[in-house]
From Swiss-Prot:
Disulfide bonds: none annotated. It holds the Pfam family Arg_decarbox_C. It comes from Shewanella loihica (strain ATCC BAA-1088 / PV-4). The gene is speA. Pathway: Amine and polyamine biosynthesis; agmatine biosynthesis; agmatine from L-arginine: step 1/1. This is Biosynthetic arginine decarboxylase.
């Protein structure tokens, strides 16, 4: 009888550490979500939720959003800073600014803004990094504090739109990223009769560690050097507009894993702030940018997929460093701003889809090679016998290496025409048989076994063909080796019988999830319950709410997935709302300037030319349905 428990499942998939308490596993072995931490007793089973959506006509894959998680993340971050401000007697306040580049979906932005609708003084603003984003936030920022921060490269039109935002009642901070922007801002402000609110992005010497570390340091794409900062100060003094400089901004990069890097960046930027104040500037806001990390792998480490600090520690470090510096230099304490988009959005979205097929190794009975067989085959047969005879633990490693060497020789001889196809097939099957036997007798308790066990897991892993596009739904997994938690949505009440790798349905060998979160850290395979064609086998990809949608591409013309907003009411009842259909085939063809209407005319011509009259209507109907259909697989039975 198995001693497997739900606790083992939590450990095996490291759920307690990457989920922030928002996702869990029920006693029935199904993955759950608790979208409203104020009511942790109210949970949603993701497996049943997906089945209900399919019954209602929502085809998989589907991206499911939980807006209550967005509300929780906003308020948690604001509360962390508010408590730190109280703890250190910091003499100013905190503003959370959401950079919409992280996820520009209307539902996401509106839910973030709605999270503080009941607050007398909302602590929310919006950030734009381009003209399209600015046009969006100009129409939405009034739902919160009306604070807008404008980053990125700016032309005259961008700058004029930002200044017009002031006329619309917003507080718009135009952050100077390049020295040349200052002249344009001042000229256009005079034309419009607007007093601009200026910000400076300073280029720090300090550079944090991580995948986005190029955002900081002396060679960073954006920001002003110390000399350029002085140039701006002198230019503003000459124009008698030094009071317009109201914000200091820096950015170490997204996903800063080490809290020491954050402290170092705040400390250096704090010195800039104090020096600017001494020069007569009136900087009122200190914007630390992004960097607040998400613990994707749950290791609480300095890994680029993790973080070695918590939310309280993050806020305490920023507040305490700037508090001490301002007191030391007798300077007023500025309003603190952070642009923490990844932290706000990552957890709120889950991609749910189905496994449409598998390829698994099953041991086959093999006959012993005859006397005339190549020596390599005889060696492999003998090695298998040694495993079956339970060789000592260190000898198992040698057996594995010997078999791999023999197999490599078989492949070489086959390529040279010195070995038959049947011999090669036998050798490959025997290799898998030996690996299968070795995996059964080797143990992770022996340190010297572990590297080989990892190799065996990879060699023997089942292939799960999953109905999604890695390039569309998890582009960072492909592009920068970002890790996302992956879990089967059911069957977790039993010990996993297999290990598997997830393959998407694109015609690209890169469409493979290469890294998986488990209790041992990051692995190349995922423990899974056995697959059965008798019932749907659903997979969840978690923490996909930040960047993935907008970065996703249309490789093989797989388009946007279906999406749905799911909310719990006060009684714990599930409401599926705002279901948005994903791209149809016609939609993605139009995106690459292919005209579905003209295609239909061509189909009609070809049908009339090649198809018998009694079949034409049915064929044309199928072609039309194909153009209107979902880009993902809908019927694979």
């Amino acid at each position: 009888m198995s001693n497997w428990s739900i606790k083992d499942a939590y450990v095996g998939y490291n759920v307690n550490y990457w989920s922030s308490g928002l996702y869990g596993i029920s006693e029935a072995g199904e993955v759950t979500v608790s979208p409203d931490p104020n009511h942790p007793e109210h949970t949603i089973g993701l497996n049943e939720l997906a089945k209900d959506m399919v019954k209602s006509g929502v085809a998989l894959p589907v991206l499911v959003r939980f807006p209550q998680i967005l509300h929780h993340r906003v308020n948690s971050l604001c509360n962390a800073f508010n408590q730190a401000i109280t703890r250190y007697d910091y003499q100013s306040d905190y503003l959370l600014v959401y950079p919409i580049k992280v996820n520009q979906q209307q539902t996401v932005v509106e839910e973030i803004l709605a999270s503080q609708v009941s607050k007398e003084v909302p602590q929310l603003g919006l950030e734009a990094g381009s003209k399209p984003e600015l046009m969006a936030v100009l129409a939405m920022a009034q739902k919160a504090s009306s604070v807008i921060i404008c980053n990125g490269y700016k032309d005259v039109e961008y700058i004029r739109l930002a200044l017009i935002g002031e006329k619309l009642g917003h507080q718009v901070y135009i952050v100077l990223e390049k020295l040349s922007e200052l002249k344009v801002v001042l000229e256009e402000a005079k034309k419009l009769g607007v007093t601009p609110r200026l910000g400076l992005r300073v280029r720090l010497a300090f550079q944090g560690k991580g995948k986005w570390q190029a955002s900081g340091g002396e060679k960073s794409k954006f920001g002003l050097s110390a000399a350029q900062v002085l140039n701006v100060i002198n230019s503003l003094k000459d124009e008698d507009m030094l009071d317009s400089l109201q914000l200091l901004h820096f950015h170490l990069g997204s996903q800063i894993a080490n809290i020491r890097d954050i402290r170092s960046g705040v400390s250096e930027a704090g010195r800039f702030y104090c020096e600017l104040q001494k020069m007569g500037a009136n900087v009122k806001c200190f914007d630390v940018g992004g960097g607040l990390a998400v613990d994707y792998d749950g290791t609480r480490s300095q890994s680029s997929n993790s973080m070695n600090y918590g939310l309280t520690e993050y806020a305490n470090n920023i507040v305490s460093v700037l508090n001490d510096m301002c007191r030391e230099h007798d300077q007023p304490m500025p309003r603190l701003i952070s642009e923490s988009g990844r932290y706000l959005t990552a957890h709120h979205a889950v991609l749910i889809t189905d496994v449409i097929g598998t390829e698994a190794y099953k041991p086959e009975d093999l006959q012993a090679p005859d006397e005339e067989a190549p020596q390599q085959l005889k060696n492999m047969w003998d090695s298998w016998g040694e495993v079956s005879g339970r060789a000592d633990q260190r000898a198992l490693i040698e057996i594995y290496h010997d078999v791999q060497s023999d197999l490599a020789e078989v492949h070489s001889l086959f390529a040279l025409g010195q070995m038959s196809l049947s011999d090669r097939a036998w050798a490959e099957q025997m290799n898998l048989r030996v690996c299968y036997e070795l995996k059964g007798v080797m143990s992770g308790k022996y340190r010297f076994h572990r590297p080989v066990i990892d190799e065996l897991n990879e060699k023997l892993a089942d292939k799960f063909f999953v109905n999604f596009s890695l390039f569309q739904s998890l582009p960072d997994a492909w592009g920068i080796d970002q890790v996302f938690p992956v879990m089967p949505l059911s069957g977790l009440d039993k010990k996993p019988e297999r290990r598997a790798v997830m393959l998407d349905i694109t015609c690209d060998s890169d469409g493979t999830v290469d890294q998986y979160v488990d209790g041992q850290g990051i692995e190349t395979t995922l423990p899974v319950p056995a697959w059965s064609a008798e019932s749907p086998y659903l997979i969840g990809f978690f923490l996909v709410g930040a960047y993935q949608e907008i970065l996703g591409d249309m490789h093989n013309l797989f388009g946007d997935t279906n999406s749905a907003v799911v909310r719990l009411d006060d009684d714990g009842l599930v409401n599926i709302e705002s279901v948005l259909a994903g791209d149809t085939v016609a939609d993605v063809l139009r995106y690459v300037n292919l005209d579905a209407v003209s295609f239909m005319r061509t189909y009609e011509e070809l049908v009339n030319l090649h198809i018998q009259e009694d079949e034409r209507a049915n064929i044309l109907e199928e072609l039309q349905i194909g153009l209107k259909g979902y880009t993902y697989l809908e019927d694979f039975s």
